[in-house]
Amino acid sequence: MAVAAVRAAAADAAVTFLWVLCVSTLGASTAAVTSYLRIHEGIHYALLVTVSLLSVLLFAFNLLCDALGGASFNPTALAAFHAAGLSSPRHSSLFPLALRFPAQAAGAVGGAMAISELMPEQYKHMLGGPSLKVDLHTGAAAELVLTFVITLAVLWIIVKGPRNPIVKTWMLSISTVCLVLTGAAYTGPSMNPANAFGWAYVNNRHNTWEQFYVYWICPFVGAVLAAWVFRAVFPPPAPKPKAKKA
């Protein structure tokens, strides 16, 4: 069990490193694509490009996570699937989670530091990660609500949504972009404590109460509440009784 937990944590660290490295380029990639296509008017065109790029990224990372045995780049996703009773048996205990959360945070730090060095100078102003733009409690409430909504959407799309993986990925991308736009004036937003911690570390804000309260406690509360709501509406099937041996 300990070996499997360490392997899962290592896979999470690697995937989170790559996720933060790649997803941080979405703004620059959208700007580059719209410039290449000479699309300078209408924000809806830029949003379409962003959703398309995010869909490709999510599809690729879903394949990568599956290949690594269920790796994840978002601590709230692990907590939500655990609370909803949807975790696999080997990932359902608390010990693996206790290893995977800090591993994801460490991977995010590495990804944020790497992209800060690799990003071309003309696009570096697009980096920086989520940051609080309102008072502390308003930001905390916003992060809780946003994480609740995205978690509920993710659970429904993955468990009860369409079977086609491309359609699922497109729906996840649209949901994510809509909530990012909604929360932009509040917290950034993050909806992913590891990603928020990575950028907070780069900007030397990782050891503050704001980081812990707004970007860790409240997203976890929102994710677990969403999981409980999902479990109440869509209860998992009862385990089949084992056949007694004659």
Swiss-Prot record:
Keywords: Membrane, Repeat, Transmembrane, Transmembrane helix, Transport. The keyword Nucleotide-binding does not apply. A motif (NPA 2) lies at residues 192-194. It is a multi-pass membrane protein. Expressed in roots, leaves and anthers. Gene3D superfamilies: Glycerol uptake facilitator protein. The chain crosses the membrane at residues 13-33, 45-65, 95-115, 139-159, 166-186, 214-234. A motif (NPA 1) lies at residues 74-76. The keyword Membrane applies. It comes from the Eukaryota. Signal peptide: none annotated. InterPro entries: Aquaporin-like, MIP, SIP1-1/2-like. Its main location: membrane. One of its GO terms (cellular component) is membrane. SUPFAM superfamilies: Aquaporin-like. It holds the Pfam family MIP. It is found in: Membrane. One of its GO terms (molecular function) is water channel activity. Aquaporins contain two tandem repeats each containing three membrane-spanning domains and a pore-forming loop with the signature motif Asn-Pro-Ala (NPA). Belongs to the MIP/aquaporin (TC 1.A.8) family. SIP (TC 1.A.8.10) subfamily. This is Aquaporin SIP1-1. It comes from Oryza sativa subsp. japonica (Rice).
